[in-house]
Amino acid sequence: MRKNPMDVIKKKHWWQSDALKWSVLGLLGLLVGYLVVLMYAQGEYLFAITTLILSSAGLYIFANRKAYAWRYVYPGMAGMGLFVLFPLVCTIAIAFTNYSSTNQLTFERAQEVLLDRSWQAGKIYNFGLYPAGDEWQLALSDGETGKNYLSDAFKFGGEQKLQLKESATQPEGERANLRVITQNRQALSDITAILPDGNKVMMSSLRQFSGTQPLYTLDGDGTLTNNQSGVKYRPNNQIGFYQSITADGNWGDEKLSPGYTVTTGWKNFTRVFTDEGIQKPFLAIFVWTVVFSLITVFLTVAVGMVLACLVQWEALRGKAVYRVLLILPYAVPSFISILIFKGLFNQSFGEINMMLSALFGVKPAWFSDPTTARTMLIIVNTWLGYPYMMILCMGLLKAIPDDLYEASAMDGAGPFQNFFKITLPLLIKPLTPLMIASFAFNFNNFVLIQLLTNGGPDRLGTTTPAGYTDLLVNYTYRIAFEGGGGQDFGLAAAIATLIFLLVGALAIVNLKATRMKFD
């Protein structure tokens, strides 16, 4: 009797078994749980929450048959959440804090650092280290009285207290040299030497022991007292520092470093619009960023469209060669082209200035004059961007029916009329979304500015470092990493948040304007 094919049970391989699948998922779940707990214990709450959400969603999707379709979407969604949304949330969160090079620690860690500081209080003793078989002996000498003190033999390892006795002479044997002391510096730092009178001394330099005491003492009300000067300090959660207090309880001028991170609310955002040293360069840089992006988009589209029309011209011979030559700037990595142009535009030895000097007797100051520096940026960016627009236009030109040009030729239209009446209107509509994307890209064109001008020439009289060719993204970078008064990550994050809102608003306005124009 012939078996029904439906009755045949498909044999599973060992790697397709449910037991193996659930075992692997269980191990992954345990590993993720351990990592989340570890992150939470270290105070990295945002990382812990993100890891928990992404991992839980992934385990559910790949364990549940009903969510099979989501397996194709999950990698893209997880990537977007991890590399787009997570950095965005982190940036916005930092914008509401005073996080900077001077305020990186938590309050507890900053307090620990201050309490670990000590000051030298008491006599200074010269010390020597002498071998005693497999062990060592510590010898101290008082330079004022000439007395010598000697410890019993000991071995290095961990914190230990050595009782010293007065000795008439130094131990026999060769004194350890500086190399040996340097190699055992950490172990020597853990030794507390107790003198016959009960005073305790510790290593203060590579050749000396001295009496040390904690510089600060933590009082019951949370204030720190300087044991050397008697000044009291209280945590000021408005600025994130321990700050001195006067006798009447008011804040003094002295602040203790390191500081700690606190929430400052909208302070970083208000600084952008109220601090003249930040407001003036910010507004000027914003205007220049918009102008730079608009001019770049206009020139790259114009040059790319015209060249695309020329290389598509039927009467032109050798079109393939021209296409290859015109696309070459797009094939060369942009950072290489930018550095080559930086050499060509060199004010003293660049080929461009040599040629202009020979022809017209002028040598423009490409890097020291704001106007010529901006002109140079637009020239270089047009060179880098037109091949992309040309490739797009070459493809879109194929979609325009030849009947339109034949009909216009019968009406006596010329090449310019064909371009402005037929080609341009039919190309501009499909190009609009790409032009908006190009605008957003050039709005944040960090690499061009950083490699070609580094934002220069610099503006004078500003609170933060700013240059005439800086875009907003470069301005943010300089505040975060190149500030002369320290790296202000909170202010940089606030400006980055404003850039995000500005680019988003401009994109929405452009899309709505385009929709109104073509509807």
UniProtKB/Swiss-Prot annotation:
InterPro entries: MalF_N, MalF_N_TM, MalF_P2, MalF_P2_sf, MetI-like, MetI-like_sf. It is found in: Cell inner membrane. It is a multi-pass membrane protein. One of its GO terms (molecular function) is ABC-type maltose transporter activity. Keywords: Cell inner membrane, Cell membrane, Membrane, Sugar transport, Transmembrane, Transmembrane helix, Transport. The chain crosses the membrane at residues 19-41, 45-62, 75-97, 289-311, 324-346, 375-397, 418-440, 489-511. PROSITE patterns: ABC_TM1. Its main location: membrane. The gene is malF. Part of the ABC transporter complex MalEFGK involved in maltose/maltodextrin import. Probably responsible for the translocation of the substrate across the membrane. GO terms for cellular component: maltose transport complex. This is Maltose/maltodextrin transport system permease protein MalF. GO terms for biological process: maltodextrin transmembrane transport. Residues 1-18, 63-74, 312-323, 398-417, 512-519 are cytoplasmic. Residues 42-44, 98-288, 347-374, 441-488 are periplasmic. Belongs to the binding-protein-dependent transport system permease family. MalFG subfamily. The complex is composed of two ATP-binding proteins (MalK), two transmembrane proteins (MalG and MalF) and a solute-binding protein (MalE). Residues 286-510 form the ABC transmembrane type-1 domain.
